[in-house]
From Swiss-Prot:
HAMAP family: Ribosomal_uS11 (MF_01310). Gene3D superfamilies: Ribosomal protein S11. It comes from Prototheca wickerhamii. The keyword Cell membrane does not apply. GO terms for molecular function: structural constituent of ribosome. Belongs to the universal ribosomal protein uS11 family. It comes from the Eukaryota. This is Small ribosomal subunit protein uS11m. InterPro entries: Ribosomal_uS11 (IPR001971), Ribosomal_uS11_CS (IPR018102), Ribosomal_uS11_sf (IPR036967). Disulfide bonds: none annotated. It holds the Pfam family Ribosomal_S11. The keyword Mitochondrion applies. The lineage of its organism: Eukaryota, Viridiplantae, Chlorophyta, core chlorophytes, Trebouxiophyceae.
Length: 128
């Protein structure tokens, strides 16, 4: 008697592309996933993961935020992303490394940090 293998029906997942915006400030790292039109799909920051106060600005926190967003995006059907980086904080490189660890394919990395050409006066230096 022949026994047929039961065919497992695979859920059809549309392979989506998206844009990941990384804004790295001195106090926090904000990571947003948008679709190609610019509509926000997911948002993760170091603060939403439970890091508080000065721990939000660490390199580890930004990497953890990127990994959390990447796993959410992969489960939702995103496969390829474009990364846009903005800001002068510490967490830029570790956030990119966190995205590279995931199964998402990074097509392009863009630096979109605005650079002032003698515009507004910068804030005064800290005296500690």
């Amino acid at each position: 008697m022949l026994v047929k293998k039961s065919q497992i029906s695979r859920k059809f997942i549309e392979k989506k592309s998206g844009i990941v915006h990384i804004q790295s400030t001195t106090n926090n790292t904000l990571i947003t996933l948008t679709d190609l039109e610019g509509n926000t799909q997911f948002f993760v920051s170091a603060g939403t993961l439970g890091f508080k106060n000065s721990r939000k600005s660490t390199v580890y926190a930004s990497g953890a935020a990127a990994e959390a967003l990447a796993s959410k995006a992969f489960n939702e059907g995103y496969r390829t992303i474009i990364v846009k980086i903005k800001g002068l904080g510490y967490g830029k490189k570790s956030a990119i490394r966190g995205l590279q660890k995931s199964n998402l394919v990074i097509k392009q990395i863009q630096e979109v940090t605005p650079i002032a050409h003698n515009g507004c006066r910068p804030p005064k230096k800290r005296r500690v």
